[in-house]
Amino acid sequence: MSPTEAPKVRVTLFCILVGIVLAMTAVVSDHWAVLSPHMENHNTTCEAAHFGLWRICTKRIALGEDRSCGPITLPGEKNCSYFRHFNPGESSEIFEFTTQKEYSISAAAISVFSLGFLIMGTICALMAFRKKRDYLLRPASMFYVFAGLCLFVSLEVMRQSVKRMIDSEDTVWIEYYYSWSFACACAAFVLLFLGGISLLLFSLPRMPQNPWESCMDAEPEH
């Protein structure tokens, strides 16, 4: 790696590191979407919900002056449970009939693949610096790109799941919005995908600049 490319690689890896932290935060948290139910005029409280890839949390909160349910950050009685298809011993009847089981399992499984690609990419990147083997940055970059693509697919599956749930005739939820976990996953996708492509370009051998040069004239990699 040439001295001019080393700073670019370090900056790119720092951006990828931020993407890794955001991706892990999104996968383990349960604020991908926030749901609000239909409100009756005589109600004084409402039960809002937020959920992620693995579990749903409901919170009973007092209605505001505008008769709206929320925001979800208001104090109230909170109850969290894992989705029944992940933990049969848990009870989540309030959500079980309105969610799409296949969508939920698919989004969670794809996110696990993303974390696996992140681990393999990080191992390659560490070996590239510790063993002075710059060529390992190329597979590392591809692993990061694959991780970003998996996150994108997981985001789209989750978005379709929420949309189908809201459109269902059996659901009690009529309003929703995506929360900070979803935003973390979106930011992680951008950082990992663009960072992986940039890292791949920076780690490629120098191309010939003149017609009489060849790739064999480039500086050897260590």
UniProtKB/Swiss-Prot annotation:
The gene is CACNG1. Component of a calcium channel complex consisting of a pore-forming alpha subunit (CACNA1S) and the ancillary subunits CACNB1 or CACNB2, CACNG1 and CACNA2D1. The channel complex contains alpha, beta, gamma and delta subunits in a 1:1:1:1 ratio, i.e. it contains either CACNB1 or CACNB2. Residues 30-108, 156-179 are extracellular. Pfam families: Claudin_2. It is a multi-pass membrane protein. Glycans are attached at residues 43, 79. Residues 1-10, 130-134, 205-222 are cytoplasmic. GO terms for cellular component: L-type voltage-gated calcium channel complex; plasma membrane; sarcolemma; T-tubule. It is found in: Cell membrane, Sarcolemma. The keyword Hydrolase does not apply. The chain crosses the membrane at residues 11-29, 109-129, 135-155, 180-204. GO terms for biological process: calcium ion transmembrane transport; positive regulation of muscle contraction; regulation of calcium ion transmembrane transport via high voltage-gated calcium channel. Regulatory subunit of the voltage-gated calcium channel that gives rise to L-type calcium currents in skeletal muscle. Regulates channel inactivation kinetics. This is Voltage-dependent calcium channel gamma-1 subunit. Keywords: Calcium, Calcium channel, Calcium transport, Cell membrane, Disulfide bond, Glycoprotein, Ion channel, Ion transport, Membrane, Transmembrane, Transmembrane helix, Transport, Voltage-gated channel. PANTHER family: VOLTAGE-DEPENDENT CALCIUM CHANNEL GAMMA-1 SUBUNIT (PTHR15025:SF1), VOLTAGE-DEPENDENT CALCIUM CHANNEL GAMMA-1 SUBUNIT-RELATED (PTHR15025). GO terms for molecular function: calcium channel regulator activity; voltage-gated calcium channel activity. Skeletal muscle (at protein level). It comes from Oryctolagus cuniculus (Rabbit). N-glycosylated.
